[in-house]
């Protein structure tokens, strides 16, 4: 390498040196990953973001340099210059790209020392609170770093694909308007407008619809979103979604773009070519066959309706359910009977009873014999038809749920998933996508005694069901909405939108939002609909959740650089935190919590 090329901190990253560069000079910068003293020779593994290079120090060639190298400790930041040499026979390491060479050190500069680390970067650390408190160190771990690289690659592919398809990336406001009909907003007080507040956006929903009214035609954004809600393992108060919207589209147009984008992501990130199109299931089909609106299609078992088998049954439990208009559903867990002992079965019964069932009837097939307290109530014709319908064989475990359709399906859906997890019935390295369509537009809340949107109030009713709006048959109206599901996890959801002022006002009124409140909260959108709003629709995919699945991570916190913990706290910066009294005074805010003391 020419001398002029040796200026600056480094000439290469720690994954780039190889046999082709033997004899060349190189400069590397990074962190001391490990240090080893082997019979006089001193070795360090030097690590940067891209990889590791072994550096060797010879005591006889440069004693002062060797003495300086002996001072090194793990995670010291150093700059090393030297000559690339081939490793001696028997010392090569095929597990890393630089494993055939080493850098023979000629100079060493310690750029910054390091305190001893609170945990070993090479180990899995169970104490997540400790990791998050030292997140800047946790991010040095290869596993977490890889998650961020995958996240970057996914974002890059999204931008590449959507730009190629004619979408414009447009940023929408972070300081927005509060519309408290959904989840709780994060509020931001305005200093210049005392007593008034911005809200951090839960989604760019209204802005992207306004962009369609503006004639943008195709919009996308990798959008930051905020929701002040109770946290679960798969939730964060701030999250990122791949957001897109387009004008003059049908449902299939949106699905095609999303499928092709995901196909490209899988090819570039995992080297896997997905088959298109993805499976399509209506909401009713998903509920009836899988007991869930986000079915895991890796599990082969399907729920089946066996009501016809027992239409004339003498088994009182089933007969009473049928007479009340209920259903009899069955799940045949193929080959699982030997894997489910009495305690495991009690666990399944507990799931059913927790969801409102009185119990969980079952049949074990042992050889050619059915083991169950209920089979004595079945006629020979019922047994024969049940065996045919469920394809019952030795070692099968059949579970029954009887009651109202939705309840019976949901119970077996949860048991289906739990039983598959319990008996290792979910194949690894499979990617099963599905679109779920034709959701109900509304759902009734007995607690609130009002109708709510299943998705959001801007979702377009199915054209075949529009007359039911005026007839008051709200529970029979389908939505032009669609969710995309991967391996039982909802990746995202979207819909075609309402773009007529009168129809939007009608939906608002069904949801209990009066005219005055409509104008207060959504007047800007209703006004826009009077100026030539085009038909439009879109979707939002959870970027964090998608990357979590792609990397096999257990939590969203693994794929976010600086996440909050389960209590919504950033343990690194200790936020949220108290603020200065003067800041509150400027915002005309007075706290009313006696447990919080802020000194002037």
Swiss-Prot record:
Binding-site residues for L-aspartate, renumbered to this chain: 181, 227, 455, 497
Residues that coordinate or bind ATP: 227-229, 236, 490, 542-545
Q: Which Gene Ontology terms describe the biological processes this protein takes part in?
A: aspartyl-tRNA aminoacylation
Record-level GO cellular component terms: cytoplasm
Q: Name one Pfam family in it.
A: tRNA_anti-codon
The segment annotated Aspartate runs over 205-208
Key words, A-Z: Aminoacyl-tRNA synthetase, ATP-binding, Cytoplasm, Ligase, Nucleotide-binding, Protein biosynthesis
Keyword ATP-binding appears in the UniProt entry: yes
Q: Where in the cell is it found?
A: Cytoplasm
Sequence similarity:
Belongs to the class-II aminoacyl-tRNA synthetase family. Type 1 subfamily.
Q: Which NCBIfam families match?
A: aspS_bact, PRK00476.1
PANTHER family in the record:
ASPARTATE--TRNA LIGASE, MITOCHONDRIAL (PTHR22594:SF5), ASPARTYL/LYSYL-TRNA SYNTHETASE (PTHR22594)
Question: What is this protein identified as?
Answer: Aspartate--tRNA(Asp/Asn) ligase
Source organism per UniProt: Methylacidiphilum infernorum (isolate V4)
Taxonomically, what lineage is the organism?
Bacteria, Pseudomonadati, Verrucomicrobiota, Methylacidiphilae, Methylacidiphilales
Q: Which gene encodes it?
A: aspS
């Amino acid at each position: 390498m020419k001398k002029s090329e040796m200026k600056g901190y480094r000439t290469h990253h720690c994954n780039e040196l190889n046999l082709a560069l033997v004899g060349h000079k190189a400069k590397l910068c990074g962190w001391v990953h490990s240090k080893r003293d082997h019979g006089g020779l001193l070795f360090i593994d030097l690590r940067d973001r891209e990889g590791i290079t072994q550096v060797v120090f010879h005591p006889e060639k440069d004693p002062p340099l060797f003495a300086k190298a002996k001072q090194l400790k793990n995670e010291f930041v150093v700059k090393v210059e030297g000559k690339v040499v081939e490793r001696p026979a028997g010392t090569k390491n095929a597990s890393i790209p630089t494993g055939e060479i080493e850098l023979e050190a000629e100079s060493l500069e310690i750029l910054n020392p390091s305190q001893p680390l609170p945990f070993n970067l090479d180990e899995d650390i169970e104490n997540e609170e400790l990791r998050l408190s030292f997140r800047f160190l946790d991010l040095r771990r290869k596993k977490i770093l890889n998650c961020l690289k995958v996240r970057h690659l996914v974002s890059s592919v999204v931008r590449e694909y959507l730009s190629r398809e004619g979408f414009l990336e447009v940023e929408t406001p972070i300081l927005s308007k509060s519309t408290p009909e959904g989840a709780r907003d994060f509020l931001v007080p305005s200093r210049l407008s005392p007593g008034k507040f911005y809200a951090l956006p839960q989604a760019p929903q209204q802005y992207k619809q306004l962009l369609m009214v503006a004639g943008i035609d195709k919009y996308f954004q990798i959008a930051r979103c905020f929701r002040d809600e109770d946290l679960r393992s798969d939730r964060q108060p701030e999250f990122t979604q791949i957001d897109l919207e387009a004008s003059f589209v049908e449902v299939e147009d949106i699905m095609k773009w999303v499928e092709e984008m995901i196909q490209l992501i899988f090819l570039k990130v995992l080297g896997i070519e997905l088959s298109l199109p993805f499976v399509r299931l209506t909401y009713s089909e998903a509920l009836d066959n899988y007991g869930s609106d986000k079915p895991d299609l890796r599990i082969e078992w399907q729920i089946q309706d066996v009501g016809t088998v027992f239409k004339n049954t003498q088994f009182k439990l089933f007969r009473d359910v049928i007479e009340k208009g209920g259903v009899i559903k069955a799940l045949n867990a193929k080959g699982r009977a030997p894997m489910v002992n009495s305690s495991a079965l009690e666990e399944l019964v507990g799931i059913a009873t927790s969801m409102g069932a009185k119990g969980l009837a079952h049949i074990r097939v042992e050889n050619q014999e059915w083991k169950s307290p209920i089979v004595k109530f079945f006629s020979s014709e019922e047994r024969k038809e049940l065996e045919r319908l469920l394809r019952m064989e030795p070692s099968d475990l059949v579970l029954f749920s009887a009651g109202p359709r939705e309840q019976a399906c949901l119970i077996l859906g949860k048991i289906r998933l739990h039983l598959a997890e319990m008996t290792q019935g979910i194949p690894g390295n499979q990617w099963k996508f599905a679109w779920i369509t034709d959701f109900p537009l509304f759902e009734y809340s007995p607690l609130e005694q009002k109708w709510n949107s299943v998705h959001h109030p801007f979702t377009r009713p199915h054209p075949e069901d529009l007359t039911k709006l005026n007839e008051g048959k709200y529970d029979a109206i389908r939505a032009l909405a669609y969710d995309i599901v991967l391996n039982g996890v909802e990746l995202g959801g979207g819909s075609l939108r309402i773009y007529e002022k009168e129809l939007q006002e009608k939906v608002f009124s069904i949801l209990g939002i009066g005219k005055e409140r409509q104008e207060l909260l959504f007047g800007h959108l209703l006004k826009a609909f009077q100026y030539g709003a085009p038909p439009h629709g879109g979707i939002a995919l959870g970027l964090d959740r998608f990357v979590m699945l792609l990397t096999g991570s257990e939590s969203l916190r693994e794929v976010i650089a600086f996440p909050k913990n389960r209590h919504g706290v950033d343990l690194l910066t200790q936020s949220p935190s108290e603020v200065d009294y003067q800041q509150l005074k400027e915002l005309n805010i007075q706290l009313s919590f006696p447990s919080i003391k802020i000194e002037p």
